[in-house]
């Protein structure tokens, strides 16, 4: 595949993630959009690593670290969302004002 096609795909995924993160009112949907953004960045890391220096695996290794961090972020985020749901009976972002108490 050509470099431009992969970068367009990555930009498309990143744009969908940003749009969903900005317009989302549900915490679970916001977490999913954040994962889309991280995956778009991973695609860029792997693409540029392969395009500029295919003998070294720096971009691929960095992508593995980002995937591991994203998995931890998803686990912690879903635990926080489930805790908020237990207390508030809602996962809507605008109804979660935990700092006001």
Swiss-Prot record:
Catalytic activity: a plastoquinone + NADH + (n+1) H(+)(in) = a plastoquinol + NAD(+) + n H(+)(out); a plastoquinone + NADPH + (n+1) H(+)(in) = a plastoquinol + NADP(+) + n H(+)(out)
Signal sequence, renumbered to the chain: none
Major localization listed first in the record, in broad terms: plastid
Gene Ontology BP terms: ATP synthesis coupled electron transport; photosynthesis, light reaction
Keywords: Chloroplast, Membrane, NAD, NADP, Plastid, Plastoquinone, Quinone, Thylakoid, Translocase, Transmembrane, Transmembrane helix, Transport
Transmembrane segments: 2-22, 32-52, 61-81
Keyword DNA damage: no
Subcellular location: Plastid, Chloroplast thylakoid membrane
GO CC term, one of those recorded: chloroplast thylakoid membrane
Superkingdom classification of source: Eukaryota
A Gene Ontology molecular function term of the record: quinone binding
EC class (word): translocase
Keyword Nuclease: no
Membrane topology: Multi-pass membrane protein
Residue stretches in coiled coil: none
Pfam families: Oxidored_q2 (PF00420)
Assigned EC number: 7.1.1.-
Complex formation: NDH is composed of at least 16 different subunits, 5 of which are encoded in the nucleus.
Similarity-based family: Belongs to the complex I subunit 4L family.
Chain's role: NDH shuttles electrons from NAD(P)H:plastoquinone, via FMN and iron-sulfur (Fe-S) centers, to quinones in the photosynthetic chain and possibly in a chloroplast respiratory chain. The immediate electron acceptor for the enzyme in this species is believed to be plastoquinone. Couples the redox reaction to proton translocation, and thus conserves the redox energy in a proton gradient.
Name of the featured protein: NAD(P)H-quinone oxidoreductase subunit 4L, chloroplastic
Gene: ndhE
């Amino acid at each position: 595949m050509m470099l431009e096609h992969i970068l367009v795909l990555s930009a498309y995924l990143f744009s969908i993630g940003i749009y969903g993160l900005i317009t989302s009112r549900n915490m679970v949907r916001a977490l999913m959009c954040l994962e889309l953004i991280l995956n778009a960045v991973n695609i860029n890391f792997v693409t540029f690593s392969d395009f500029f220096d295919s003998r070294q695996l720096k971009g691929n290794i960095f992508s593995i670290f980002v995937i591991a961090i994203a998995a931890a972020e998803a686990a912690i985020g879903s635990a926080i969302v489930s805790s908020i749901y237990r207390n508030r009976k809602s996962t809507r972002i605008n109804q979660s004002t935990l700092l006001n108490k």
